């Protein structure tokens, strides 16, 4: 008893680690036998004590935490604020997600800490508390889920679900929470991540790889080693774990004294000596070289010294031990623990966030303000940063609390502020934590409602790809979804139009857009609206042209139409154009469109180059019929250069023949292309269509224009059209004539038609007329006299249809057959014309042509003229009534088959169009336009918009324009490269004059606005920044400078008084000055001061379907000299206000698509987007707010909710839609904030439906360290798959090392050393990664087990093709050691590269085919082995088990080992090699020292750096 009394009583808790230490010390002191007796007594004692008290787990023991209620409430409040910010557009979706995750994670963690103290204080003997915190079962996270809250969940892909589970398992989950928690459940229906990585299967594969690894020798004689040094910041614990049980590869000296020799195993005593030495002399300490399984020279076994001590009895491993199977099971067995552990924790998210410090009580907070300086938190909220540890005191009524905040933390409250209990007062920054792997994640944002997309000017308007609708954001900006309610009816149920408004409206139909012109007085608008839609004979306008000009009796409106693929035209050219509707023609009432407009184009900044087209117009009389596609034929002179045959690029234009028209249509870049009905698309296909290049020359003889004449003005026309600003320049390089090829390429038609034209050239005097009979005869009379013509007199349109079909399509019609209209050609296509069918098969496709008309078989072949255009009946020469004659025919000469001399004549109807000869500048423009000044000249040029003899295809229900007239500008002064153009409107005594002033002197007005194109900016371009340079208009001198230059060409338009002035200018900051006197205002405003200049700014926005202009009203009774109003902003200052301003001030409001004039609002309304009255919010301005605030509101401005513009807040975010005197209307809109680099889906002004994708964010997030990733991660590494996005896939890294290292070293040695270094590098990296996963789970596995597996995974090399070898075939997988030995034996270098195989592939690439066959694919493996005649030497365990032999381990090892008699002499050989070994080591194997360490594992052995050779790269 006395002895027992003297013993020290250890009153400490003992855990697993302490037990391990105790047992190892007992074994050291007493040996194995005696220790087992002691442990039995401890076990008996434990069982006895455990059963004396019974702990039962009841539901009452699950105590919920009292503080949970207000903690959750606090988090909900923060989430609500965050949601509000998101709703206002202040934070974007990713930011909201991140903050939401942090709020709930911090709440959950705080609740977990509270749970611990709550148990400890209230019920320390609580069974749940005892069970989990003693480590017996479960952990804190599981108990937290039982009694705290489950918190945020991660789905199987590791993505966060941002809806937290607020309940715990004690309270029970709601249905939503249950479904979310199912995502975290393992082995459930939802989970897919773990199913593939079953622990048992992993163990099986691991054992399969290494089952043949047996300790067969004492020493393999290796001279390689791996260095371990604690100098790199390696922890002592890790250092000890690494060294214990290993064998030294070198003698170790301290000074000159040797303390350990080579091949000595390292025990705890030796390690302690190493540690004390390192502590004493940290800088002089040398690294310790140890042997590992990696360094063993054997191929299919391992030696005692490379393996080291056995884990079971602490001595060197015995010969015949199956260490491979032990290694496989050691790694596979904790996998079951990992799986079980993931099941218990259930996918609960664990992320790294900052710790929060909360106030212990209510009170006043105080700290030294000099020690902090203001900053912002990562979420943008204001905070203070403390550099050093900061002491904070909280003074409550009766107690003083003191809190110490560590350095680099954020203080979230101000000094002397009153704080409440549990309020967050500081945020502690987490220390330099381990490097978290980050991954790039895409987050899609979807529209929450139907609406129309708008964005600010910060978005690129050209899409990222040519045909795509994706745009990258160059900087952070807002997207707005304007509310609409979709409605198909064309009559508005709710209208914002006031009395006396003019409106144009049109509807959508299935196959195109129909636009109706309303020509009537104002008061008739209401009645005519209803019956416009009933008439069938309305003109169908071109769905794809950018602008249409229409008139309603007062104005010419410009209608941009919508086509999804052409609204970026302007953006691509980086030019800003605008069209001005200027003239109205009364004579043209009978035509479908009641006017034709002169469109004036002025490029961005108003700079005109030489030979620029400044204006053009399209005459509606020259519009193509709706009948279909066909050929335009004419004879030209002046524009011969521009419209030469364009054949060169026809072959390569053929991408996918079926979609030829559509895809080419999308490619057009400028507005002119649209006007010319996509001339390029059809011209370039000439070769393929089989219309001979010289066919149109037949017209030459008819019109009597000689060949040489028709080239006379080539250079001049090139001069006219060569301007880079202009699309109509000649393209000599692209479209040269190609006469030789056309004969060979195009088969029968071309040969025959060539004969035709020769035939016709032989009779140049004759013209042909078709009689009523079948024969065609020659007549000698000429209808036209030979005269010199500058322009084309007449052109013809001949119907023809072409189908380009895939090669594989089956035709339902025969070649040379006659078909009717609407005949089925293939399964999906029908003919639009009737007539002769010609089929031509090409390599890639089939062409099917349909020629309309009749077929005649002539009796005498020599009298027939092919390719002629013939009038059916005579007309007098002076007859001008009929501009369009449909009574011509076109005669074509065809051969039925190439081989037979059988001819027939195809007579095709043609439509003739006469050109207007008498038109000149005077007929188009007022007379004073011709007063040219200052060397500027204008020329009028007509041209035909189609290539001669080219097929023009019908597009939808379009009407193409055949003829366009252009106004071309030129000047003589050589030194002037460019002219400046601007538009001015002058009103004097009520007469309005519009001037287009073009001068050679640079204008004084500065153009500061950015470029805006067809879809750029919603209603008004700038919601935040006003980029107008208003200063240039503030002084009178600058205003008058507009008229300083005298080189005005003259007015473009004279109008009478009753036509109000309407100018639509571009957003390129053109201005106009209105001088007015005695103007009458409809509201009875008094006469304004005479000659007050009011600059008026306009914006033309080609929005979804119309124009927007805003106007400044006339303001009376101002004492100041002038008043500036830009973009309808109400900009009021107190000193400008007079008493009667409230009554007289009138702001005119404009709809989204509207034109506004001085006296009344004119709008056109897209009836397809009906505005719901409930989505428009009227916001009334208080009457007295005018004097108190100078806030600016303007039409089209986007306003976020709760912005305080006036006395009251804005109740809903949206766009200002109508501005009245005392109120304005907001169209409801939802803002979305999008960050730089985000991708916007969709087009500006596009209608989106609820759930459509709006934006895609790409952001980096720390990879959540969810426990589910334990086992799959290990399995991924073993299978050599990519495991994280930061370090590239190991296979790719090995490829890099394979390439770089031989290149650095050079020569045949490079491959040997390169493969060695690569394999060593990848092995160390892999071991570290696997250990990292296991250690994160608290599982300890000895490195040597992992090393044995990794050794097999990395032991193969692939023979490369660089050097041919007689032994191995290129691409063959061989063991590294085998490759080295073969190279030494053959005295020739074998070139090979290191390769990383996964464990499954290694199992199928062993020396034993019986082992492979028992693993997978048995039949295939055995068949291949039989064919190759493979021999299995039965060295492994599995082969012997399968065949029922004795396995070569344990007792069966003895007879196996006698095969090696040379084993005895091995030791002496090693001694002899020592000298050579030291030299070799210097050359080759000290590469391990190059390895840099990682901060996590921090020694050379545990390295994870990208490449050890970074300096060389």
Curated annotation (Swiss-Prot):
Keywords: Chloroplast, DNA-directed RNA polymerase, Metal-binding, Nucleotidyltransferase, Plastid, Transcription, Transferase, Zinc. Gene3D superfamilies: 1.10.132.30, 1.10.150.390, 1.10.1790.20, RNA polymerase Rpb1, domain 3 (1.10.274.100). GO terms for cellular component: chloroplast; DNA-directed RNA polymerase complex; mitochondrion; plastid. The keyword Chloroplast applies. Binds 1 Zn(2+) ion per subunit. One of its GO terms (molecular function) is DNA binding. GO terms for biological process: DNA-templated transcription. Residues 659-679, 726-737 have a biased composition (Basic and acidic residues). It is found in: Plastid, Chloroplast. Its cofactor is Zn(2+). SUPFAM superfamilies: beta and beta-prime subunits of DNA dependent RNA-polymerase. Its main location: plastid. The keyword Transferase applies. Its EC number is 2.7.7.6. Residues 680-707, 738-767 have a biased composition (Acidic residues). Zn(2+) binds at residues 220, 296, 303, 306. Residues 644-769 are annotated as: Disordered. It catalyses: RNA(n) + a ribonucleoside 5'-triphosphate = RNA(n+1) + diphosphate. Pfam families: RNA_pol_Rpb1_4 (PF05000), RNA_pol_Rpb1_5 (PF04998). InterPro entries: DNA-dir_RpoC2_beta_pp (IPR012756), RNA_pol_beta''_euk (IPR050254), RNA_pol_Rpb1_3_sf (IPR042102), RNA_pol_Rpb1_4 (IPR007083), RNA_pol_Rpb1_5 (IPR007081), Rpb1_funnel_sf (IPR038120). Belongs to the RNA polymerase beta' chain family. RpoC2 subfamily. DNA-dependent RNA polymerase catalyzes the transcription of DNA into RNA using the four ribonucleoside triphosphates as substrates. In plastids the minimal PEP RNA polymerase catalytic core is composed of four subunits: alpha, beta, beta', and beta''. When a (nuclear-encoded) sigma factor is associated with the core the holoenzyme is formed, which can initiate transcription. This is DNA-directed RNA polymerase subunit beta''. It comes from Oryza nivara.
